[in-house]
C-alpha cells in the first residue's frame, strides 16, 4: 500500500516543483522578454517563443543566447540573470501557450510603406528575374543573369516566395506568420502583414488579387487582400495543412492535411470549401501541369498516390521505399511521353515515373541523400543534390550520372534556373556558403557569389504553375515542330508569333490535329503540314507554348 500511496505523492511533488518553476519563469518572462516577444509569446518585434519554434534548440544554446544576446538581431544580453533564472524562463517558453489570434490582430500588424524610397532596377526581362533567399543574413536578393540588382531584409525568411501573375511583385513568407511584398517595378519593399503565428505556406489566387495563407498556429486559412493586406476571410481548420496551391485554369485552390485523410477545395471567388475523402493523409503533393491530378505521398513514406480531380477519387497507388519529396519533384517531356522525377528523403536515389499512365521507369542512384530535383527544357540534365559537395547531373536521355565538383566540405542544395534556362543557380548551404551560377549546357562556372546559408531561388517561369505547360510545350516544339517553324521568324512555315496573332486558338488546335481538313478552311490551296498525331496532353502543351508569342496590350503583363 505504501508504494501505491508514495508514487502519486512523488508525482505531485515533481509536478508542484515544475509548476513553481513555470510560475517563476512566467514572471521573469513578463519582466524581461514580453516587450519584444509579446505578452502571450506570439512575438511582436521579435520572434514568437513557443514549443514549435524552440523544440530543436538545445538548452545550452538557449542559455547562451539569453545570457549573451544576439547582436545580429539586436537582442540584448541579460548578464544580470542567474543560470537558474534563465532555466526557469526556458521552461516557461517551452511550455504550451494559449494563443488568441483574430482578424483584429492581423489588421493591427499591417505595415505599409507610405513613402517608400523607389529606384529603377535595370530589368531586361522579368521572366529571367531570380529571387534568392539568404537565410543566414535574413535577406532576399533580386538577381538577373549574373547581377544582383537589389537586396532587402526580411526577418526569419524561410523560402516559398510567390510571384504575382505579372511577375513584378514578390510575396515573401516567414515561418512566424509574416508575409511581405517587394515591388520589382519600383525597386522597393512595399510592406508586410502578420497573418498568423506559425505559417506553413502562401499562394495567390490566379488573378493575383488574394493571398492564401495556410497556418498551423492557429490552425487556419487566412485570405488577405494582396494590395491592402487586410483580411478578407479567416477560415478555422481542425487539422495541420500540408500546403495550399492555386489552380491557374479555374478559380480554385487545393490543400491537403498532414493529419487528416481529406483534400480541400477552396473556391477563390466565394471562399467556400468542399472536401473529399482520401485513403490516407497527403503530407506532400504536387498538381500535374494540366491540373487533372494530385500526386501525393504520406508521412509514413510507404505509398505514392494519384488522385483524379475529375473523378474525385484515387486512381493509382504504389508502394514506395522512402518518402518521396514531391514538392521538390521535376517534370519534363521526351519522345511523346511526360515524366516526373522525385527525390526520397533519407534515401540515396531518385525515382523516375511516367505521368498519366503512372508507370515506374527507373531508380537512379545519386550517391547520397538528396532533397531537390530540378530541370528545364534548355538543359539536358536533371540537377540534384546528395548532401555532399558535388552537383549530381542525370542525363534525361539515358539516366547516366555525372558530377560537378564545387568546394570541398561544402553542401550543395537546390538548383534553380532563370526563365530562359541557360543559367543554373546552385546553393552551397553553409554559413560561409556561396551562390554558384553555371551555364546549364556547357556546365562552365560563370560566377561565385559568397552567401550565408543561401537556400531557395525563385523564378516566375519555374515556380508559377501556369508556366508548367509552357515549358513542356517548348520541349514538344523542339521535337515536333522545329524543323518547319520558328518562334518569331518566318521559316518554311509561318512563325508561331504570326500564327497566334492571326488565328483563333480553336483554329490553331484544329489545324494541328487535322491539317488535311483545315487547310481549305484557312484559305490554302494545298496542305503542306504533316499530321503529327499528338496526344491531348502534347496538343495542350504546344498550344500553351505558342500562346506565349501573342502580342500583349500591357508590356508588363506576363
Feature locations, PLM:
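Positively charged n-region of N-terminal signal peptides that target proteins for export
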Residues: 1-4
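Bacterial N-terminal signal peptides
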Residues: 7-16
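Predominantly soluble domains enriched in secretory-pathway, periplasmic, or organellar proteins
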Residues: 19-23, 31-32, 39, 60-71, ...
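Short linear capping/connector segments at secondary-structure termini
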Residues: 46-48, 525-530
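Gly/Gly-Pro-rich "capping" loops immediately C-terminal to redox-active cysteine motifs
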Residues: 26, 38, 42-70, 77, ...
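The canonical Cys-X-X-Cys-His
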Residues: 25-39, 89, 93, 140, ...
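C-terminal capping alpha-helices of c-type cytochrome domains
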Residues: 60, 79-105, 506-507, 529-558
Amino acid at each position: 500500500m505504501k508504494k501505491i500511496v508514495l508514487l502519486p505523492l512523488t508525482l505531485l511533488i515533481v509536478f508542484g516543483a515544475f509548476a513553481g518553476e513555470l510560475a517563476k519563469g512566467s514572471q521573469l518572462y513578463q519582466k524581461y522578454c514580453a516587450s519584444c516577444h509579446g505578452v502571450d509569446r506570439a512575438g511582436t518585434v521579435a520572434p514568437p517563443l513557443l514549443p514549435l519554434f524552440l523544440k530543436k534548440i538545445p538548452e545550452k544554446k538557449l542559455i547562451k543566447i539569453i545570457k549573451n544576446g544576439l547582436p545580429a538581431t539586436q537582442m540584448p544580453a541579460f548578464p544580470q540573470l542567474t543560470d537558474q533564472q534563465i532555466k526557469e524562463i526556458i521552461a516557461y517558453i517551452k511550455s504550451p501557450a494559449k494563443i488568441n489570434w483574430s482578424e483584429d490582430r492581423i489588421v493591427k500588424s499591417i505595415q505599409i510603406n507610405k513613402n517608400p524610397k523607389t529606384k529603377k532596377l535595370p530589368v531586361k526581362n522579368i521572366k529571367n528575374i531570380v529571387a534568392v533567399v539568404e537565410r543566414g543574413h535574413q535577406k532576399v536578393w533580386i538577381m538577373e543573369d549574373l547581377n544582383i540588382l537589389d537586396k532587402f531584409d526580411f526577418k526569419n525568411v524561410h523560402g516559398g516566395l510567390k510571384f504575382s501573375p505579372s511577375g513584378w511583385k514578390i510575396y515573401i513568407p516567414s515561418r512566424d506568420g509574416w508575409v511581405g511584398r517587394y515591388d520589382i517595378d519600383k525597386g522597393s519593399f512595399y510592406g508586410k502583414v502578420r497573418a498568423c503565428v506559425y505559417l506553413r505556406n502562401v499562394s495567390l489566387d490566379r488573378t493575383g488579387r488574394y493571398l492564401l495563407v495556410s497556418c498551423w498556429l492557429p490552425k487556419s486559412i487566412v485570405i488577405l487582400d494582396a494590395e491592402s493586406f487586410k483580411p478578407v476571410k479567416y477560415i478555422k481548420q481542425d487539422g495541420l495543412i500540408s500546403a495550399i496551391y492555386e489552380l491557374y485554369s479555374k478559380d480554385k485552390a487545393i490543400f491537403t492535411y498532414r493529419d487528416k485523410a481529406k483534400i480541400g477545395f477552396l473556391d477563390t471567388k466565394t471562399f467556400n470549401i468542399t472536401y473529399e475523402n482520401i485513403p490516407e493523409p497527403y503530407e506532400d503533393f504536387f498538381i500535374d501541369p494540366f491540373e487533372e491530378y494530385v500526386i501525393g505521398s504520406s508521412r509514413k513514406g510507404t505509398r505514392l498516390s494519384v488522385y483524379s480531380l475529375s473523378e474525385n477519387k484515387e486512381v493509382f497507388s504504389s508502394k514506395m521505399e522512402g518518402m518521396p519529396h514531391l514538392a521538390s519533384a521535376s517534370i519534363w517531356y521526351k519522345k511523346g511521353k511526360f515524366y516526373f522525377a522525385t527525390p526520397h528523403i533519407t534515401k540515396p536515389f531518385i525515382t523516375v515515373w511516367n505521368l498519366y499512365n503512372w508507370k515506374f521507369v527507373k531508380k537512379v542512384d545519386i550517391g547520397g541523400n538528396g532533397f531537390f530535383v530540378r530541370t528545364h527544357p534548355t538543359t539536358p540534365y536533371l540537377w540534384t543534390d546528395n548532401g555532399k559537395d558535388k552537383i549530381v547531373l542525370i542525363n534525361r536521355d539515358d539516366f547516366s550520372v555525372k558530377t560537378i565538383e564545387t568546394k570541398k566540405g561544402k553542401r550543395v542544395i537546390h538548383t534553380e534556373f532563370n526563365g530562359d534556362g541557360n543559367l543554373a543557380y546552385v546553393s552551397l548551404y553553409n554559413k560561409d556558403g556561396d551562390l554558384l551560377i553555371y551555364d546549364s549546357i556547357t556546365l562552365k562556372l560563370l560566377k561565385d557569389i559568397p552567401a550565408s546559408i543561401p537556400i531557395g531561388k525563385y523564378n516566375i517561369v519555374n515556380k508559377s504553375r501556369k508556366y508548367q505547360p509552357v515549358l513542356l510545350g517548348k520541349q514538344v516544339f523542339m521535337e515536333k515542330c522545329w524543323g518547319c517553324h520558328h518562334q518569331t521568324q518566318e521559316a518554311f512555315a509561318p512563325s508561331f508569333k504570326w500564327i497566334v496573332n492571326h488565328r483563333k486558338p480553336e483554329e490553331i488546335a484544329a489545324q494541328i490535329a487535322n491539317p488535311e481538313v483545315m487547310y481549305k478552311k484557312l484559305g490554302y490551296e494545298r496542305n503542306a503540314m504533316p499530321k503529327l498525331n499528338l496526344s491531348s496532353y502534347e496538343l495542350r502543351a504546344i498550344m500553351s507554348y505558342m500562346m506565349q508569342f501573342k502580342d500583349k496590350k500591357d508590356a508588363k503583363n506576363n
